């Protein structure tokens, strides 16, 4: 009879440095786990379990929203809706890629890096996906058909390449320069977010203090919730609070990466609601403007960006595979001090 045994968990001093997490002292899986061990570990309480499920379940929520909207009467046949549908594709992809990365990252040091390369690529595509509905529905009136509007989506595609490249490169610096690694990775994701949300920041500044007299430039409440969740997400990612203040207390539940996941998916939910609000409230006004990028152009841009990001990931993966097994990136040294784990 087939017998499945849950994998044994380890303390931080029992795993190579490449697997350490800041402030997480226990609940580590074996760094040579099989794929089956990794899947089984998602059903036992490890320091990754909540990370896995907080992105696995939202994947199905966003997929349900995509199918529900796409299956609506006449929704797919209306070109006005296409940017929203294309946005929802990477909105489904990024939590799924994150879930897979957290599930299979304990198979080996090389596999850990490759898993997160793919995770970063999916996040980069999500940053591009955000640009489609913002360009179609959320641009300020004074920006329509200007240079920024015309190049908004192509610039977002280039930003996705920069995001993937910097974030993947940051993993090569983790052990020798953890501070620089964290700065590069945080900047890699903060910059596309700031660029994508330029239309919202401008509309917010334009309407500040004007109450209800802002017309089509007014932001919905969902926009505010989205921006707040994004700010909180960035803070949690950069600070590693609360586990940094009490190492070992939040190993299984309540550490920053779990809270980061929850805030990220809540932010995406509110972003979707905000886009739907802009679609509805600005439709009559946008109908008088020139049509946005068609479905073929929208999908082609996303596909080309996905191909470019995969090439970047392939280049970093090839570099990783050529590295000797003895290099610090793949091994790390013994625990020094026993109180701090490295930053992810």
Swiss-Prot record:
<feature type="topological domain" description="Extracellular">
    <location>
        <begin position="73"/>
        <end position="83"/>
    </location>
</feature>
<keyword id="KW-1003">Cell membrane</keyword>
<feature type="transmembrane region" description="Helical">
    <location>
        <begin position="52"/>
        <end position="72"/>
    </location>
</feature>
<feature type="transmembrane region" description="Helical">
    <location>
        <begin position="293"/>
        <end position="313"/>
    </location>
</feature>
<comment type="subunit">
    <text>Homodimer.</text>
</comment>
<feature type="topological domain" description="Cytoplasmic">
    <location>
        <begin position="1"/>
        <end position="51"/>
    </location>
</feature>
<dbReference type="InterPro" id="IPR004254">
    <property type="entry name" value="AdipoR/HlyIII-related"/>
</dbReference>
<keyword id="KW-0675">Receptor</keyword>
<protein>
    <recommendedName>
        <fullName>Membrane progestin receptor delta</fullName>
    </recommendedName>
</protein>
<dbReference type="GO" id="GO:0038023">
    <property type="term" value="F:signaling receptor activity"/>
</dbReference>
<feature type="topological domain" description="Extracellular">
    <location>
        <begin position="135"/>
        <end position="147"/>
    </location>
</feature>
<keyword id="KW-0446">Lipid-binding</keyword>
<dbReference type="GO" id="GO:0005496">
    <property type="term" value="F:steroid binding"/>
</dbReference>
<feature type="topological domain" description="Cytoplasmic">
    <location>
        <begin position="280"/>
        <end position="292"/>
    </location>
</feature>
<feature type="transmembrane region" description="Helical">
    <location>
        <begin position="114"/>
        <end position="134"/>
    </location>
</feature>
<feature type="topological domain" description="Cytoplasmic">
    <location>
        <begin position="105"/>
        <end position="113"/>
    </location>
</feature>
<keyword id="KW-0812">Transmembrane</keyword>
<keyword id="KW-1133">Transmembrane helix</keyword>
<dbReference type="Pfam" id="PF03006">
    <property type="entry name" value="HlyIII"/>
</dbReference>
<feature type="topological domain" description="Cytoplasmic">
    <location>
        <begin position="169"/>
        <end position="217"/>
    </location>
</feature>
<feature type="transmembrane region" description="Helical">
    <location>
        <begin position="148"/>
        <end position="168"/>
    </location>
</feature>
<keyword id="KW-0472">Membrane</keyword>
<feature type="topological domain" description="Extracellular">
    <location>
        <begin position="239"/>
        <end position="258"/>
    </location>
</feature>
<keyword id="KW-0754">Steroid-binding</keyword>
<feature type="transmembrane region" description="Helical">
    <location>
        <begin position="84"/>
        <end position="104"/>
    </location>
</feature>
<feature type="topological domain" description="Extracellular">
    <location>
        <begin position="314"/>
        <end position="344"/>
    </location>
</feature>
<comment type="similarity">
    <text>Belongs to the ADIPOR family.</text>
</comment>
<feature type="transmembrane region" description="Helical">
    <location>
        <begin position="218"/>
        <end position="238"/>
    </location>
</feature>
<comment type="function">
    <text>Plasma membrane progesterone (P4) receptor coupled to G proteins. Seems to act through a G(s) mediated pathway. Involved in neurosteroid inhibition of apoptosis. May be involved in regulating rapid P4 signaling in the nervous system. Also binds dehydroepiandrosterone (DHEA), pregnanolone, pregnenolone and allopregnanolone.</text>
</comment>
<feature type="transmembrane region" description="Helical">
    <location>
        <begin position="259"/>
        <end position="279"/>
    </location>
</feature>
<dbReference type="GO" id="GO:0005886">
    <property type="term" value="C:plasma membrane"/>
</dbReference>
């Amino acid at each position: 009879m087939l017998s499945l045994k849950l994998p044994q968990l380890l303390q931080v001093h029992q795993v190579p440095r490449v697997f350490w997490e800041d402030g997480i002292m226990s609940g580590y899986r074996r760094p040579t786990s099989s794929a089956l061990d990794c899947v089984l570990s998602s059903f036992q309480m490890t320091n990754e379990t909540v990370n896995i499920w907080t992105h696995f379940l939202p994947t199905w929520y966003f997929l349900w929203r995509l199918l529900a909207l796409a299956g609506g009467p006449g929704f797919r046949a209306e070109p006005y809706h296409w940017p929203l549908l294309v946005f929802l594709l990477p909105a489904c992809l990024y939590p799924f890629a994150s879930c897979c990365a957290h599930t299979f990252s304990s198979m080996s040091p090389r596999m850990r890096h490759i898993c997160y390369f793919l995770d970063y690529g999916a996040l980069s595509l999500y940053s591009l996906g955000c640009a489609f509905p913002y360009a179609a529905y959320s641009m300020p009136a004074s920006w329509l058909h200007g240079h920024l509007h015309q190049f908004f989506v192509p610039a977002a595609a280039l930003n996705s390449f920069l995001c993937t490249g910097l974030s993947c490169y940051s993993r090569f610096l983790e052990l020798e320069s953890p501070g620089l690694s964290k700065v590069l990775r945080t900047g890699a994701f903060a910059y596309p977010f700031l660029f994508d949300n330029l239309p919202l920041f401008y509309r917010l500044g334009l309407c500040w203090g004007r109450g209800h007299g802002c017309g089509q430039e007014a932001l919905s409440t969902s926009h505010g919730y989205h921006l707040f969740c994004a700010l909180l997400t960035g803070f949690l990612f950069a600070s590693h609070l609360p586990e940094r203040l009490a190492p070992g207390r939040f190993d299984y539940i309540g550490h920053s990466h779990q809270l980061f996941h929850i805030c990220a998916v809540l932010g995406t939910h509110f972003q979707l609601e905000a886009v739907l609000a802009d679609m509805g409230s600005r439709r009559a006004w946008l109908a008088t403007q020139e049509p946005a990028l068609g479905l073929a152009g929208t999908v082609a841009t996303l596909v080309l960006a996905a191909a470019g990001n995969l090439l970047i990931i392939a280049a970093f993966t090839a570099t990783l595979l050529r590295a000797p097994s003895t290099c610090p990136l793949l091994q790390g040294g013994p625990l020094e001090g026993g109180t701090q784990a490295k930053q992810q």
